[in-house]
Every structure is written in structure tokens, then in C-alpha cells.
Amino acid sequence: MVDKTQGIIDPPIDELLSKVDSKYALVIFASKRARQINDYYADLHEGSLFDNVGPLVDSTIDDKPLSVAMHEINEDKLVATPIVEPAAS
């Protein structure tokens, strides 16, 4: 049995867009999480384990942080909540 190829086309963009308000929100959300994952691996290399949260889905060291972030969003491990800014007086 051949495993399903994973990458930027998996999970499908339509499934990801159902989790957020817009494409822009998806890009910002996924990129911020990918940066956290990247920082986690850098901290792991330096011996510091408690500064960042690692991947919340099964992944290997070869998986790109952005792909891991997309899988986390698709599996509802992360939820985007809009920031409500106070009204100007």
C-alpha cells in the first residue's frame, strides 16, 4: 500500500479556508505557527525545551514547519480567534 503524498497540496486549500475567515487570515495564522515550530526546533538543538510549543500533529524532522502548521489547522489542533480592537474615542 502506498502512503498518500503529503505536502503543500495536502490538506486541500478548501478545507483550510473553511477554518478561517479569509485567505489572508490563513496565511498569517499558518506563518506565525510555522515560525513557532521553527523556533521550537532551534531551541531543541540548543537544549532549551520550554520556550516554544512543538508540533501538535505527528510529523518528522523532514516536514517543513509550514506544512506542519497547515496540518495542525486542518485537524483543529489550532483555532484562529479574531482580535477585537477597542473602538477609537
Swiss-Prot record:
Q: Which GO terms describe its biological process?
A: DNA-templated transcription
Single Gene Ontology MF annotation:
DNA binding
Which Pfam family is one of those matched by this entry? RNA_pol_Rpb6
Question: Which reaction(s) are listed as its catalytic activity?
Answer: RNA(n) + a ribonucleoside 5'-triphosphate = RNA(n+1) + diphosphate
Tell me which domain of life the UniProt entry assigns to the organism this sequence originates from: Bacteria
EC number annotated for this UniProt entry = 2.7.7.6
The record's keywords, sorted A to Z, are: DNA-directed RNA polymerase, Nucleotidyltransferase, Transcription, Transferase
Asked if the keyword Heme belongs to this entry, the reply reads: no
The UniProt entry's coiled-coil ranges are: none
Q: How does it assemble?
A: The RNAP catalytic core consists of 2 alpha, 1 beta, 1 beta' and 1 omega subunit. When a sigma factor is associated with the core the holoenzyme is formed, which can initiate transcription.
Q: What does this protein do?
A: Promotes RNA polymerase assembly. Latches the N- and C-terminal regions of the beta' subunit thereby facilitating its interaction with the beta and alpha subunits.
Protein's name in the database: DNA-directed RNA polymerase subunit omega
Which organism encodes this protein?
Answer: Clavibacter michiganensis subsp. michiganensis (strain NCPPB 382)
